[in-house]
């Protein structure tokens, strides 16, 4: 009984990440025989830490990325705004990468669901791990447009094109 139920369930990847951020440094090319749409995703991370000693109240004395604010418990909390950058590689057919290229521009806010993969890159004679998020066409991964300055909420058009490309193949 369990095996028949198990066969009907779709096996999903264990390594799955969801990121929201601004995209920039867009590149289009080929990796082996697969078409690639690659960009850098910049995510803003807000980190709260308790302040051990009282901080000065003037906002000019603190760096621009650090502010103090009262916590609901009445404690002083220091907020750090950090920016993290991730490389995203969208792999698929040429029609898939062309659709992404036509609808996504620099500065767009996107949601990325994909698989985190680490590759080794040789830099100055040393091998260094290089993490990137892999978005494969039709593999429980997606790139969705959240906000664009030039195109007002055209995510439905992007998703329609991507699904039509998937059904053609």
UniProtKB/Swiss-Prot annotation:
Name the record gives this protein: Uncharacterized protein Tb927.8.680, mitochondrial
Keyword Hydrolase found: no
Subcellular location: Mitochondrion
GO annotation, cellular component aspect: cytoplasm; mitochondrion
Keyword Nucleus tagged: no
Keyword terms: Mitochondrion, Transit peptide
Species annotation: Trypanosoma brucei brucei (strain 927/4 GUTat10.1)
Membrane-crossing residue ranges in chain numbering: none
InterPro entries in UniProt: NA-bd_OB-fold
Lineage: Eukaryota, Discoba, Euglenozoa, Kinetoplastea, Metakinetoplastina
The organelle targeting sequence, given as a residue range: 1-91
Start and end residues of each stretch annotated as Disordered: 54-76
Highest taxon, organism lineage: Eukaryota
Comp. bias (Polar residues): 61-71
